[in-house]
Amino acid sequence: MKFIAVVAALTASLAMAAPTESSTDTTYIACPISLYGNAQCCATDILGLANLDCESPTDVPRDAGHFQRTCADVGKRARCCAIPVLGQALLCIQPAGAN
């Protein structure tokens, strides 16, 4: 009877000590879901209120640098916008981690 209790306790302690996920395995979210949740590549920024000639990035951003390079490849800047409509976007900010 004591043997079963010892085995059960040992098994439980091993299960609790096993790591679940790597903490370095994070996913980059350029524009967290909020008011500014739409990733856009825009050519002209007018005081952060309006952006002109905007389009969605051609690749899903892997990190801030990748997002900026993807937009720079088409001559635009990475932005997180609130309301993208017909190539224009209202209320835009820089993406997370961008310079």
UniProtKB/Swiss-Prot annotation:
Q: Got any disulfides in this one, which pairs?
A: 31-80, 41-71, 42-54, 81-92
Q: Where in the cell is it found?
A: Secreted, Cell wall; Secreted
CDD domains named in the record: hydrophobin_II
Location (main, coarse):
secreted
Q: Does the keyword Disulfide bond apply?
A: yes
Pfam families assigned = Hydrophobin_2
Alphabetical GO CC annotations of the entry are: extracellular region
Residues of the signal sequence? Answer: 1-26
Q: Which domain of life is it from?
A: Eukaryota
List UniProt keywords, sorted A-Z.
Cell wall, Disulfide bond, Secreted, Signal
InterPro entries, per database record? Cerato-ulmin_hydrophobin, Hydrophobin_sf
Q: How is it used?
A: HFB1 is partly responsible for the reported antifungal activity of S.alkalinus, and may serve as a potential source of lead compounds, meaning that it can be developed as an antifungal drug candidate.
Family that this chain belongs to: Belongs to the cerato-ulmin hydrophobin family.
* Protein purpose: Aerial growth, conidiation, and dispersal of filamentous fungi in the environment rely upon a capability of their secreting small amphipathic proteins called hydrophobins (HPBs) with low sequence identity. Class I can self-assemble into an outermost layer of rodlet bundles on aerial cell surfaces, conferring cellular hydrophobicity that supports fungal growth, development and dispersal; whereas Class II form highly ordered films at water-air interfaces through intermolecular interactions but contribute nothing to the rodlet structure.
Quaternary context: Homotetramer. Further self-assembles to form highly ordered films at water-air interfaces through intermolecular interactions.
- Designated name of the protein: Class II hydrophobin 1
Q: Which gene encodes it?
A: HFB1
